[in-house]
Amino acid sequence: MAVYTEVPDEALAAFLADYDIGGLLSYKGIAEGVENTNFYLHTTVGSYILTLYEKRVAEGDLPFFLGLMEHLAARGLACPQPIRNRAGTALGRLCGRPAVIVSFLDGVSVRRPGVRHCRALGRALAGLHAAGVDFPMRRPNALSVAAWRPLFAQAEAQADRVAPNLAARTRDDLARLEEAWPRDLPGGVIHADLFTDNVFFIGDAVSGLIDFYFACTDAFAYDLAICLNAWCFELDGSFNRTKGQAMIAAYQAARPLDPREVESLPLLARGAALRFMLTRLVDWLNVPPGALVKPKDPLEYDRKLAFHRRVTGAEEYGWTP
């Protein structure tokens, strides 16, 4: 279970006493998630999620994340809404960790999304980008192209233990992407981690977007490229162009891509794949003793990179004029 900080009953009761969310009926740890400690709270008023932020989330970034969720929820986006305590603040402390209570969202994530899920996700992503346009805070993307070489430096010496010639392939990718990375594309608030486990569905409709703790200010099309990587590859490693076409078309129905974004899509998709390969690779090589959470396989994204290197245009992802 992904519960890194144990919370005694007495400490939890004292923390909840500062909130107008009713009396606690039950609570349990949530196994999903690898970054933070999460609990499901059931009270006499309703259901909530309690999150304790572990070391990987910088406390100084929390006002951005929490402010963004409040902003998006106020504009009708289905996302967790931070609950403020009686003092009027959303951010508290519990067991030495920054802690927040947010609203509970109904729905389930899908492990193997179909075309209809990809279409709904494209529509929801465009809605997120539109809702965040007037959000006043900014947060640079700490895991964009400038961060990839320092990340690789942490793993380069051991990379070929994970897969033959992985280090050489990664050096080539870095050189190409650093040279050609697109700048000044249309941008604003992006989610930057909208994998299938961060999207809830009821039927074929998106019922909620969660886990905004990589959200930042960057190119909108990069967020779309992350989603193409996360949603449109099959288990055999092939890219499903039908899913890509559904996602891109639904996104474009709300926010048409401009010609620069279309031209840049292959590089953005390759860069997105490299970003997740590198963070997974570093985690894979640095599993702490006794870890309860298995790190994600970096080679899944090494295989996706092999596809992106061959792509010559956005049409291969399903974009149509």
Swiss-Prot record:
Coiled coil: none annotated. Belongs to the pseudomonas-type ThrB family. Keywords: Amino-acid biosynthesis, ATP-binding, Kinase, Nucleotide-binding, Threonine biosynthesis, Transferase. This is Homoserine kinase. GO terms for biological process: threonine biosynthetic process. GO terms for molecular function: ATP binding; homoserine kinase activity. CDD domains: HomoserineK_II (cd05153). Its EC number is 2.7.1.39. It comes from Methylobacterium sp. (strain 4-46). SUPFAM superfamilies: Protein kinase-like (PK-like) (SSF56112). It catalyses: L-homoserine + ATP = O-phospho-L-homoserine + ADP + H(+).
